[in-house]
Amino acid sequence: MLVPPDMMAAQTRMVYQMNRFCTERVQARMYKTATAIREICKIVQDILKEVELQEPRFISSLVECNGRFEGVEVISPNEFEIVLYLNQMGVFNFVDDGTLPGCAVLKLSDGRKRSMSLWVEFITASGYLSSRKIRARFQTLVAQACDKSVYRDMVKMVGDTSEVKLRIRERFVVQITPAFKCSGIWPRSAAHWPVPHLPWPHPNIVAEVKTEGFDLLSKESVIMQNKNNNAASMEGDAWVLSFFEAENRLLQGGCRRRCLSMLKTLRDRHLDLPGNPISAYHLKNLLLYECEKHPRDFEWDEGCIADRINGIFLQLISCLQYRRCPHYFLPALDMFKGKSPSALEQAAKQVWRLTRELLTNANAFEKL
């Protein structure tokens, strides 16, 4: 098919501008983030070392590999989450019946005695391994470790939460989340995935993702807000499902990861709004939906990235207007749950302003 020269020139100019945006804005963000991660991980490693001395069941899994710290997720430029993997989940059954969207429970296997578990004192009368009880114990240990740390003058525990959050140098907030890795099984609530008859992702990658599995995190969930006491008590024992590694594996190939880096940079520069209605994780999920709409690798080459970003922002506007953003793997889970309607409304207007600029101004990336 013949393409008009002026159209080719416009696309070439757009690619040039996006490459420049990546060099000047995205790389700067990545460098700043990497510097922050190195700084906070050095401090957190010291604290976790002390925790392990006090309680050997909490073994630090925060290790540097090829210059990167594994298990660190960037929530925003100044907010991070570090996952601490726990051992010996084996005597528990994974129960995922959809009662709590985005959550599951760990129940003592039939015929297994409590004494067979490494986590015996955190098992409830009903035989559930309590996420909340483990977190409470871990929080106490981290608070004690902070008091003993050589970094104690620059680290404070964040109060008014059951989660383990540290404020470092008054600049960064780091959440340390105990977790179990669940390999070789796949949750029933994500059984619909992958969508049948779509060419993406390739069956080999699907098999890889399902073998790798998912994580169960000990953290608070907004799902149970305004629920009755019994449900809230059950929620305290429940674990939050996380597909962090699976998501990252799916975004390999083409310019998908580059697209995510650009979206995160645009979010930090233009969509960092009061109430945090739009997070980098929302954009990551919408990017995965966009991968289904555009399953071929050639649709993710550098000449198509602008179209993909526009498509993701149009999806985002629709989600903000309907006040619902379904999780990619767990569509019953609304990621806007707990966000104020006014914050979502203001966010929709801001995303539309940004999208309109991208759609109507051929030189938009020069200013963004």
Curated annotation (Swiss-Prot):
It comes from the Eukaryota. Gene3D superfamilies: 1.10.1410.40, 3.30.460.90. SMART domains: Mab-21 (SM01265). One of its GO terms (cellular component) is nucleus. Signal peptide: none annotated. One of its GO terms (biological process) is eye development. Belongs to the mab-21 family. This is Protein mab-21-like. It comes from Drosophila melanogaster (Fruit fly).
